[in-house]
Structure formats: C-alpha cells, structure tokens
Amino acid sequence: LEDGTLVPLPEKNIDTGAGLERIASVLQKKKNNFETDLFMPIIKGVEEVLEIKKEEFDETVKIIADHIRATVFLIGDGVLPSNEGRGYVLRKIIRRAFGVGSSSKGKVFEKEDVFLHKLVSYVVNNMKEAYPELEEKREYISSYKMTSLNNYLNYEKNQLLKIANQLKESGYEVKEYI
C-alpha cells in the first residue's frame, strides 16, 4: 500500500523463472528449447534460406533462429536499431545473426548475402496466432530489417576497405574481395 504496509495477494503464485521456452520443452518432451514448436519452424526457415543443414551448422542455425525471433518482436514493438539503449542491443543482435549466417556460407559482406529479412515470415507465421500484431506489422518489420542490414553492410564494407588500404600502405599484399 502507499503507506508501505504489505498485504497478502489474493492468489498465491510462485515465479519459477522457467520461461515459456523451457516450459514448452518440458511439455513437448524435447531435449532443448530449439526442438520445440516455438523454434522448429524458424530453424527450418534458416535451413531453407541459407541452404544449410542444422546437423552441420547446429550452433549457427540456433543463433540465427533465436536472434531473428528476438529481432522481429523488438522491431514489432517499436524498438529500432540505434546507438543507445534497447536500440543498441537490437543492432548487436542483428549484426551477430548476420555475421554468423554469412560466415557459415563462407561469404564476404555483399548485398546479395543479406538474408535476415527473408526469415521474418517464418517467425510471423509461427507466432501470429499468439501475437496477431506481428501479422499486421509483417511488411514494416521486413522492410526495416532490409534497410538496417543494407546500412550495416555499407558500413562494414567501408570499414574493410579502410583496413585493406592501411595494410596496403604498410606494404602488405591485399587480395580484392570487396
């Protein structure tokens, strides 16, 4: 109460800290969160879009599935990549997902490597029943993701060019990949 008095709650509850994913894995008798129906459709999407198999790139596929899901929800809730706060966290999540996906294919940062926006529909289709607002924001999330990734790629490409030029000026031989 306002005066600091504690009053027992009408319902006695205990927060186990288990979370939705852990509860789903127990109820569905799965070994981990990524084998549940919360993640498997997204994992299948990662495999299709990147043309890789979870068995060969287990950690990569799990990271991308987890990060794309978080990204879709964050952008859907109005969080945009920025240099501070939640926006900074989102930016780091996007970069990590893109980075592990690109490295799994042995690719250099190129525009045609952008793939995360293609995974938005897998998340939305899987979660729209429980979160119908995701369906309403599908196009916005996907287009924002594409814009954000293109900006990131341009930044990274410029950074790589700077490093390559510095190495050349120092007498190192640098192969042209960009």
Task: For the regions a language model picked out, list residue spans one by one.
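Structured aminoacyl-transfer and RNA-binding surfaces used for tRNA recognition/handling
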Residues: 1-92, 104-127, 131-134, 142, ...
